[in-house]
Amino acid sequence: MKTEMGKNIEALMKKWADYCHRKWPKSIFVKDGAFPCYEDQQTKILFIGRELYGKKNDGDGLVINYWNERAGMDNLGVFQSRLLYLAYGISKGQCTEAHWKKMQCATELDCRFATEEFSYAFMNASKLLNVDGTQIGDVFYDFINDKTNQDFFIREIELLNPDIIVSGNLGDIGFMAKLEESGKVKQSAKHLNNQNRFNYLFEGKIPWIDTWHFSAHKAHFEGFYQPVCEAAAIFLGKEQGTTD
């Protein structure tokens, strides 16, 4: 049974898809939203990804599977694995190397994912895939620069109502600047540890960390897990946990 939030997200997706089909008739609208048990989490985590410029990529299966009946994902890749690691670390307040070394592999975490133990929500910066498999660069930038899409995007975040947002390199494509124009997103003064990545606030209260693209060629621990989980722990005021 869908929750009130789920029903509202579904209604938003329908309106959004109708708009996109009129403006980009050759593209496929891909829904996203929350995995099961997202609303049950003590810390509600929203990831926002940026797809690659082709029809097929490591993240496509992820967004499509949000609307499957089952929990979990098939054919885990770098993109999906990193989200699992980050979600687990952020939700548990665990960001040290000792925690990392004790952590289970992504496929084992996936078996525990989308349960009361840990879950998250996911959004794509663009909701469009090309039917013919050609490059989507132009459509992608048309999408994120469209004011109506930006309004839909902000509304989806409001409905998901996360405690923290982690996005994959939206600043470098100018999307964060576009969202700042809405007045809903503001850049904070702090950088994300030693990475040249900026922190933001949504509606003046929800921490938003914009890090590397989730498929970037970076070390899992030093490039993603440690800096993002440390920043999240500071923002959320979480003590570093000791449980597995």
What is the meaning of each model-derived region?
Residues 21-36, 94-108, 143-156:
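A Trp-anchored, charged/polar loop motif used as the substrate-binding/catalytic surface
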Residues 88-116, 185-203:
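Short mixed-charge
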Residues 63-73, 89-93, 127-145:
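Surface-exposed cleft-lining segments at the edges of enzyme active sites
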